[in-house]
């Protein structure tokens, strides 16, 4: 019989085996005939053990051990079964969290979730017409086995079978949930701690064992490892501390508490050894992700005292910190130039070039971005897909280089790359910004088919509606039509889509051709109603609401604009002091006016509603049933600029007064107070410029000039804002007002824009002599 013995009454997987052979005198019962032996069946129940019976006629009985055998075996079997149950619970993944065993049925009424791995190939196949059958697809090679398989022998001997049981083996399918692998390491360390911990183990084996833990899992196991070192009364060596630091620096951001731990570990490392270049590189990377760039100068000073050269990785971390964390474009460019001209070792690679080009595109320096792109190509560096798509997006924003936008996108196909999700989003953005609604709708339809719709893509679709220009008013061709490849691309993809077959219930009108602006207004209203019902979280973005409201501003009337403005946005009153207002309404003496108003209302109600054709009836029902702001976005400065612009365009004085009053309330809110003083002043100046234009469109020139005169010392007025007022004054024959406006422009140009005065220029010419 196989006997299982517990060591010191502690559950462990260290097994001792002994063979006990009973004699024939164990029982007084008559012997039963033993049938011939058969092959053992491998189908056993969990925890069942079938003992072998062996007989020996010459063996003498041991009555003392025989008496204790049944009780000990029962206890040992009970303990073994309970321990096996514990291990099974750790090994068994949760069904609701297992991405391999659970299959969630998609909801066709909602925009589908993104599957980035399959979306790019599917969209590329749909657009290019080269989509292959799934049966002919070659399966991808299996991923490499996870780390942590090679455990030192003395630790493996202490753990027993648990080291092979919990760590995943090399199989054809290693797509195990990440949570399961993390729990394996946690259970492995806890079992090692119960089996004696680190006492008696060599430091080399312990360090080798801990080095096998993946950094993502090590980040959460640091307290347990420190506790094991303390129990064994062993000092933590500096390589282990450095492993802790490397695991804590994973991710895009580092919290202040994590930064305190990192500083503590670096102090422990410095007590055991001198800090080397690797330590300083990781330290600077940690401060960059913690957004404390000001402390980097002190670290660089320490390196200078120790005669440690600044490495290329340190420069790269500093450049990325200025670009993505500090948003300091100029200092990023200065550091980038230092990398190029300092030494050959610090020459920037294609990743640094890509980051700097992205920063130039973000700050609308397209010409500098193109210069860096051609410089990168001259040095023979590789060009990646994200760089080309970013340059295409940047060129579409520039009047000078917008014709090159689609050229960069088609270079992605020239390289033979499958466009990724970012490339498709930039493709949507370029078509939307150009006002090519037909192409934008088709690209979005393809993304619906491949379940790769993002909120950014949805925002670009609404943007295309706001940039739409009717064919009889459009003076320029679409940018894609200026390229021969673009003409073929647009023609083929428009013919390939049938809008009469909706995908996921998305309410595209069944036509690929856009006849007029009413089509755009109607479809945008239907899409907004569909999004309110299925994806209300999309509607809380202010940029999306601004594009939705701009559609009515450019293509609709005042009624449609005000309806969209009120139904899609609201004033966030957080931080606004509550003031009690009392309105006194005095009764009018002329009663016939009431009858006149009622007759006017009857006449207007009898007239047909022109907005009924362009407004979704479902949206009307939703707005009647929804009274809160859960489907609206809080208003910001840009939305108020659009509102005051609409008041001037449609010449609605009461709406302008309403927006002017509400904008004053908005300045008292927390959302406005959280802005920097520079941003607040910039937003106020933009609103003042639109207010001047609004009063000018209503022929209220004195009110417009009063706005300018009241803020002449605060805002840098220029001809860009005052040109409309000056031209209107000239048309109405108000020469004095036009002269006053010109004087304001001259004074502010000298004060804010650095232009020289006329008298100073004459003095300069006289001194110069020519």
From Swiss-Prot:
Which parts of the chain are PPR repeats? Answer: 276-310, 311-346, 349-383, 384-419, 420-454, 636-666
Q: Where in the cell is it found?
A: Mitochondrion
Q: Where is the composition biased (Polar residues)?
A: 55-65, 599-610
Main location as per UniProt: mitochondrion
GO cellular component terms attached to this protein's record: mitochondrion
Q: Which domain of life is it from?
A: Eukaryota
Instruction: Tell me the Pfam families matching this sequence.
Output: PPR (PF01535)
Q: Which PROSITE patterns match?
A: PPR (PS51375)
Cited InterPro entries: Pentatricopeptide_rpt, TPR-like_helical_dom_sf
- UniProt GO BP: mRNA processing; RNA splicing
What keywords are assigned to this protein?
Mitochondrion, mRNA processing, mRNA splicing, Repeat, Transit peptide
**Compositionally biased residues, Basic and acidic residues:** 43-53, 588-598
Extract the transit peptide range from the record. Answer: 1-90
Residue ranges for the region (Disordered) are 28-67, 90-114, 588-610
Question: Any additional notes?
Answer: Involved in mitochondrial-nuclear incompatibility, a major determinant in reproductive isolation between species, through hybrid incompatibility of Ccm1 and its interacting partner 15S rRNA between yeast species.
- Assembly, per entry: Binds to mitochondrial small subunit 15S rRNA.
Family per record: Belongs to the CCM1 family.
Q: What does this protein do?
A: Regulates mitochondrial small subunit maturation by controlling 15S rRNA 5'-end processing. Localizes to the 5' precursor of the 15S rRNA in a position that is subsequently occupied by mS47 in the mature yeast mtSSU. Uses structure and sequence-specific RNA recognition, binding to a single-stranded region of the precursor and specifically recognizing bases -6 to -1. The exchange of Ccm1 for mS47 is coupled to the irreversible removal of precursor rRNA that is accompanied by conformational changes of the mitoribosomal proteins uS5m and mS26.
Q: Can you name this protein?
A: Mitochondrial 15S rRNA processing factor CCM1
Q: Which organism is the protein's source?
A: Candida albicans (strain WO-1)
């Amino acid at each position: 019989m196989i006997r299982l013995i517990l060591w010191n009454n502690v559950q462990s997987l260290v097994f001792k085996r002994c063979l006990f052979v009973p004699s024939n005198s164990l029982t007084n019962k008559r012997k039963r005939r033993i049938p011939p032996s058969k092959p053992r069946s491998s189908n056993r129940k969990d925890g069942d053990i079938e003992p072998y019976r062996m007989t020996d006629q010459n063996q003498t009985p041991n009555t003392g051990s025989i008496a204790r055998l049944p009780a000990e075996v029962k206890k040992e079997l009970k303990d073994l079964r309970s321990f096996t149950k514990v291990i099974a619970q750790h090994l068994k993944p949760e069904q609701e969290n297992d991405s391999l065993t659970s299959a969630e049925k998609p909801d066709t009424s909602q925009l589908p979730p993104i599957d980035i791995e399959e979306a790019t190939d599917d969209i590329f196949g749909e657009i290019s017409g080269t989509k292959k059958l799934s049966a002919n697809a070659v399966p991808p090679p299996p991923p490499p086995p996870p780390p942590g398989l090679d455990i030192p022998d003395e630790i493996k001997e202490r753990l027993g079978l648990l080291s092979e049981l919990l760590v995943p083996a090399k199989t054809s399918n290693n797509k195990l949930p990440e949570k399961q692998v993390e729990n394996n390491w946690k259970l492995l360390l806890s079992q090692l701690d119960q089996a004696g911990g680190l006492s008696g183990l060599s430091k080399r084996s312990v360090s080798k064992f801990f080095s096998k833990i993946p950094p993502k899992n090590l980040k959460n196991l640091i307290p347990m490892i420190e506790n094991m070192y303390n129990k064994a009364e062993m000092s933590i060596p500096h390589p282990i501390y450095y492993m802790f630091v490397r695991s804590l620096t994973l991710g895009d951001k580092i919290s202040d508490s994590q930064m305190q731990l990192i500083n503590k570990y670096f102090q422990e490392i410095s007590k055991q050894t001198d800090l080397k270049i690797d330590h300083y590189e990781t330290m600077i990377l940690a401060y960059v992700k913690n957004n404390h760039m000001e402390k980097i100068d002190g670290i660089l000073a320490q390196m200078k005292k120790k005669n440690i050269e600044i490495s290329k990785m340190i420069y790269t971390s500093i450049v990325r910190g200025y670009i993505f964390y500090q948003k300091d474009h100029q200092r990023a460019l200065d550091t980038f130039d230092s990398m190029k001209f300092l030494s050959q070792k610090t020459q920037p690679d294609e990743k640094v070039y890509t980051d700097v080009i992205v920063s130039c595109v973000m700050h609308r320096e397209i010409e500098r971005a193109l210069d860096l792109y051609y410089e990168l190509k001259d040095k023979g560096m590789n060009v990646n897909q994200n760089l080309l798509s970013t340059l295409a997006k940047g060129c579409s924003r520039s009047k000078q280089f917008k014709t090159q936008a689609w050229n960069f996108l088609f270079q992605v196909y020239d390289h033979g790359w499958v466009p990724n999700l970012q490339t498709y989003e930039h493709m949507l953005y370029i078509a939307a910004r150009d006002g090519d609604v037909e192409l934008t709708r088709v690209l979005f339809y393809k993304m619906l088919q491949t379940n790769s719709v993002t909120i950014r893509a949805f925002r670009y679709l609404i943007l295309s509606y706001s940039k739409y220009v009717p064919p009889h008013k459009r003076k320029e061709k679409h940018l894609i039509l200026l390229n021969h490849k673009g003409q073929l691309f647009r023609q083929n993809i428009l013919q390939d889509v049938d809008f009469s077959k909706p995908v996921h219930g998305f309410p595209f009108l069944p036509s690929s051709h856009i006849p007029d602006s009413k089509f755009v207004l109607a479809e945008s209203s239907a899409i907004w109603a569909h999004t309110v019902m299925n994806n209300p979280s999309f509607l809380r973005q202010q940029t999306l609401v601004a594009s939705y409201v701009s559609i009515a501003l450019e293509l609709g009337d005042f009624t449609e604009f005000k309806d969209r403005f009120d139904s899609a946005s609201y004033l966030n009153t957080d931080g606004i002091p509550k003031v009690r207002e009392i309105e006194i309404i005095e009764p009018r003496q002329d009663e016939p006016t009431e009858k006149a108003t009622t007759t006017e209302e009857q006449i207007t109600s009898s007239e047909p509603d022109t907005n009924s054709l362009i407004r979704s009836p479902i949206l009307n029902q939703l707005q009647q049933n929804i009274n809160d702001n859960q489907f609206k976005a809080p208003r910001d400065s840009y939305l108020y600029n659009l509102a005051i612009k609409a008041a001037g365009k449609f010449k609605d004085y009461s709406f302008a007064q309403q927006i002017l009053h509400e904008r004053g309330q908005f300045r008292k809110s927390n959302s406005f107070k959280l802005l920097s003083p520079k941003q607040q002043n910039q937003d106020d100046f933009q609103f003042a410029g639109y207010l001047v234009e609004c009063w000018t469109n209503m022929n209220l020139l004195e009110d417009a000039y009063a706005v300018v005169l009241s803020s002449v010392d605060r805002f840098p007025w220029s001809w860009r804002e005052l040109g409309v007022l000056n031209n209107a004054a000239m048309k109405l024959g108000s020469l004095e007002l036009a002269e006053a406006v010109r004087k304001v422009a001259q004074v502010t140009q000298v004060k804010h824009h650095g232009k020289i005065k006329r008298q100073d220029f004459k003095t300069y010419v006289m001194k110069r002599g020519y």
